[in-house]
Amino acid sequence: MIEIKKMKGGVCAARGFVAGASGCGIKNGKVMRDDVAVVFSESPATSAATFTTNKVKAAPVRISAEHLKAGANRAVILNSGNANACTGENGLKDARTMCADTAGLLGLKPKEVLVCSTGRIGVPMPMDRVAKGIAALKPSRNGSAACAAAIMTSDTFAKEYAVEVKTSKGSFRVGGIAKGAGMIDPNMATMLCVLTTDAAIPQPTLRAELKRSVANSFNRITIDGDMSTNDTVILLANGLSACSPDMSAFSQALDEVTRALARMIVSDGEGVSRFVEVEVTGAANDKEARTAAEAIANSTLVKCAWSGGDPNWGRILDAVGYCGVKVDDTTADIFYDKLALVKNGIAAQTPFEKLRAVAAKKSFKVTVDLKLGNGSYYVWTTDLTEEYVRLNLGE
């Protein structure tokens, strides 16, 4: 019997983890809010991470991947306001310095520290200010919320989540913080996430579990189809619960946390007014289902229709048709929640006002059944509003 219960504490919910934040004015020299944060395991830990698939990788991504090889990382240093991306050799040096300064603060070796940055691309990191910010960090068991707030950029709220799991083998906890609101597309984008657990998990298993869970959460979200240079998801495990759970229990707990954080990111998308789950079923295979679902979710015309509360199914079927998957437009069905828009490729007889009422909701589901095979895939996405355009006009 497995009992999973939501709890407070974010990354500090798991035993032996502390976090903290400080402000140093990274973006413009003015200390308006916290913009440096740290998550730290007070005991030895194992680690796993996944990074952006963008071929243009930021310096912190490269340094973290290098430090991850040892698999014994205990701390993550994070900053907002500057991505440290496309900054050349100096950027790599700065990322290493951030790890070294953090290691000095916490009594670690530099390679025990991973580094994450988010913010503007192509701007040198103001290391004099960053050094002061790191020196001012005072991690505590109550620091998760401040840490989550410090890594926000265009986010409108801090994102944290944690669960406690009770099993026949004992109890353990999993928690996390995340940021992200724009440049969100499958394979992660402009999103950072740090996860912690006090479960005792061997490192090879930890890495496999993180990869699997990310595939079913953060890689299922898309807001604007753009992919960042800085995506990072990190999982630290210190085993302090003395519980070595069955993998089914750990998988369920990890998935609850990653999926909750992923949904928060989509809900907080720039200018978002609607959260939409898009599921394609009956595709020739899962790969084609994914292609079709992502085509619908990233279609500008579809997203604009959602913004206006318009159940325009023609744009949905059009997106499926141009994305390259097998489709028979004489058999496809489309549903908004459980109301049929299309049956066998033609308009269903559902009253328009009922369909419009669903499309006007803050959250609804679009299902497309291609009736060609057993392939299925879902993604979480949003509408596209004038506010999104305003937020991305530039400075």
Regions found by a protein language model. Give the residues of each.
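Generic structural marker for isolated residues within well-ordered, non-membrane alpha-helices
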Residues: C99
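A structural signal for small-residue-enriched, beta-sheet-centric alpha/beta enzyme cores
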Residues: M1-N79, A83-K93, G104-E395
